[in-house]
């Protein structure tokens, strides 16, 4: 039985050759961990590319994302896995840097868009600056799931994810994963089972009257 703490240590990403060598050994740690995680999440091992799944598990390990405590969700798309994170996981990682001061969000009913403004402490702690991201409803296919019933909430979550990526605070090894709300839009239907996280509102402290600072000044 593979223990949960096996998924937690931060490690470097393996090269494709290294991963193939380890996967060839059925008793290797990555082989056991991958099979255990997929089994726990109800994913059919015969219907998945296990080599690609192992790469996703290593990505989770390298970024301290534990799929067993809902820090990351594994979505089956055909015979491949796609890792997605909750917006709360992204936000918590950014706050842990102690550089994210606050988040302000707004919705423009005319443009049907949501904007997120992050207030960030500069690396040298000499001042504050802002990062902005705006997303438009017209950019997303909204004919399904919560995009149909809660479009404003979904737009705000997506704009927050965009702003956090732009901020450079997340520091993921490899590509920053998508959030659940981004994966819901569109026509693609995940094959087999989809581990669905609970949907919750993001409530963050608002920051007002903070002077915008150009980072290039430092």
UniProtKB/Swiss-Prot annotation:
Q: Which GO terms describe its biological process?
A: DNA recombination
Q: Which Gene Ontology molecular function entries are recorded, alphabetically?
A: DNA binding
In terms of Pfam families, this protein maps to:
RecT (PF03837)
The domain of life for this entry's organism is: Bacteria
Q: Which NCBIfam families match?
A: bet_lambda
Instruction: Tell me the protein's name.
Output: Uncharacterized protein UU154
* Species this protein is from: Ureaplasma parvum serovar 3 (strain ATCC 700970)
Q: What is the lineage of its organism?
A: Bacteria, Bacillati, Mycoplasmatota, Mycoplasmoidales, Mycoplasmoidaceae
